[in-house]
Swiss-Prot record:
It catalyses: 5-dehydroepisterol + NADPH + O2 + H(+) = ergosta-5,7,22,24(28)-tetraen-3beta-ol + NADP(+) + 2 H2O. Gene3D superfamilies: Cytochrome P450. This is C-22 sterol desaturase ERG5. GO terms for molecular function: C-22 sterol desaturase (NADPH) activity; heme binding; iron ion binding; monooxygenase activity; oxidoreductase activity.
Length: 517
């Protein structure tokens, strides 16, 4: 290729071709050639960053050539994220080969989340390797829409009612354990174990053993640790990403075996559904037998393989484990620190149960817990577990009139600023459950980005509110929670989602639910 031909290429291809031409024509010693190549690579890296950055906020130059702020990304800090959001509605960084655009305003976040023509989820850069490229979350267009519609029945009101008994059983087991602990302890790991057990029993029922639950609960943190926002481009043996992929593969193998047992229970033994796997297989069976003309049922006529089921169930665990653990930590810390809220929850719990604390949970009962539900919603707004949702740009994306995100860039809509918008939420940095009693449209709709929006909005949003409303009510009614505050209690630690920096030091004591409030 000669210089005239190079001039006719797009700019970034010109840069690449320029390097090739320079190397081909380089003369002199090997050392001179080497330094020439290094200089050209570094120049290309900086120029590429400048072209991609355009007019949006971000460092003027890549201070650390090639790697960018990679070392900072290994230890993410909430304060640094917030500074980036405050720097402009669009900002950027560049790490290794990946150019990252961050959108901090509500409207831009909604635009990105609702633009499947231009973007698709990538979770984080390495997620496709850990969750597998065949996983349904990475499907695009009609394939994704159809697959997602086939899962809607797993989170219908009818299905949610099925899951409550096993959830309540494990709530009781863990609450009794918490109350037997001698003195205060860190509850970040305790809540991770509790939520993992609740999720696995909800998803897999009795097909998964106690030993397997313990194994997944003990090891799952390696998956979380592997899914940093930006990783080294390849998986290196015995690194965090390598261990994360191994644990993910081992867990999905357990789920495959559970799916096989669920198929036998539903298809061969005509059993009734008791967990998510049962309900999915039951819906497939029902669709085949009835030859339903309902569009959603038609999608279930085909037989989903055990592998497909295992991958989908793993995404449910992936989506729920860290976010629900985060919600549990903040929710119980916040409530334990506010005796007025505790009193209101206890009053409501006895009222909806007609003063019988032994009444078991049901969907109708949970739906009556208006105040308790408002406390959960306010916790999700005040300390949203998920700060941002990474996407990859499929083709040049005109995000604003003045900026187009380049193909291949990672683009990240952030959720936190919309949930702390003072124009929508009065005193946004205060915890006020009562704000939800007369909520405005924007509070519920345009700014309520806790579960995302658009084609990838969280499937389990009603499941989350049901689970935590029921659990908060039971735990507060039947126990006293003592929060041992430290200077770090209100500081935010980022570990995939967000947690109190001191890992939440709690002490539990059993109480008579009928005693005076």
């Amino acid at each position: 290729m000669n210089s005239t031909e190079v001039d006719n290429l797009p700019f970034q291809q010109q840069l690449t071709s320029f390097v090739e031409l320079a190397v081909a024509k380089a003369t002199g010693s090997p050392i001179t050639t080497l330094f020439t190549i290094i200089f050209l690579i570094l120049s290309y890296d900086q120029l590429s960053y400048q072209i991609n950055k355009g007019s949006i906020a971000g460092p003027r130059f890549k201070f650390y050539p090639i790697i960018g702020p990679f070392l900072e990304s290994l230890d993410p800090k909430f304060e640094e994220y917030k500074a980036k959001w405050d720097s402009g509605e669009l900002s950027c960084v560049s790490i290794f080969h990946k150019f990252v655009v961050i959108a901090s305003s509500r409207d831009l976040a909604r635009k990105i989340l609702s633009s499947p023509k231009y973007v698709k989820p990538c979770v984080v850069d390495v997620a496709i390797k850990i969750l597998r490229p065949t996983n349904w979350v990475f499907l695009d267009g009609k394939q994704h829409t159809d697959y997602r519609r086939s899962l809607n029945g797993l989170f219908s009101s009818k299905a949610l009612e099925i899951y409550i008994p096993v959830q309540e059983k494990y709530m009781d087991i863990y609450l009794e354990r918490f109350c037997k602990y001698d003195g205060p302890r860190e509850f970040f790991p305790e809540f991770r174990e509790l939520l993992c057990a609740l999720s696995l029993r909800t998803f897999c029922g009795d097909y998964i053993t106690e030993d397997q639950i313990a194994l997944v609960a003990d090891n799952y943190y390696r998956v979380t640790a592997a899914l940093e926002l930006v990783n080294f481009p390849i998986i290196i043996p015995y690194t965090k990403t390598w261990y994360g992929k191994k644990i993910a593969d081992d867990t999905m193998k357990i789920f495959e075996n559970c799916a096989a047992m669920a198929k036998k229970h539903i298809n061969e033994n005509n059993g009734t559904p008791k967990c998510v796997m049962d309900e999915w297989i039951h819906l497939m069976k029902e669709a085949r037998e009835k030859h339903s003309e309902d569009p959603d049922s038609k999608l279930l006529v085909r037989e989903f393989s055990n592998r497909e089921i295992s991958e989908a169930i793993f995404t449910f665990l992936f989506a729920s484990q860290d976010a629900s653990s985060s919600l549990a930590c903040w929710l119980f810390q916040i409530v334990a620190d506010r005796p007025d809220i505790v009193a209101k929850i206890r009053e409501e719990q006895l009222r909806v149960r007609n003063n019988n604390p032994d009444v078991r949970l049901s969907l109708d009962l949970i739906n009556e817990m208006t105040y308790t539900n408002n406390v959960v919603k306010e916790s999700l707004r005040y300390r949203p577990p998920v700060l941002m949702v990474p996407y990859v740009v499929k083709k040049s994306f005109p995000v604003t009139e003045s900026y187009t995100a380049p193909k291949g860039a990672m683009i990240i809509p952030t959720l936190y600023p919309a949930l702390h918008d003072p124009e929508v939420y009065d005193e946004p940095d205060s915890f006020i459950p009562e704000r939800w009693e007369n909520a405005s449209g924007d509070m519920y709709k345009r700014n309520w980005l806790v579960f995302g929006t658009g084609p990838h909005v969280c499937l389990g949003k009603n499941y989350v509110l049901m689970l935590f409303t029921g659990m908060l009510g039971k735990f507060v009614m039947n126990s006293d929670m003592i929060h041992h505050k430290t200077d770090l209690s209100e500081e935010i630690k980022v570990f995939a989602t967000i947690f109190p920096k001191d890992d939440l030091i709690l002490e539990w004591k059993k109480r008579d639910p009928l005693k005076s409030l």
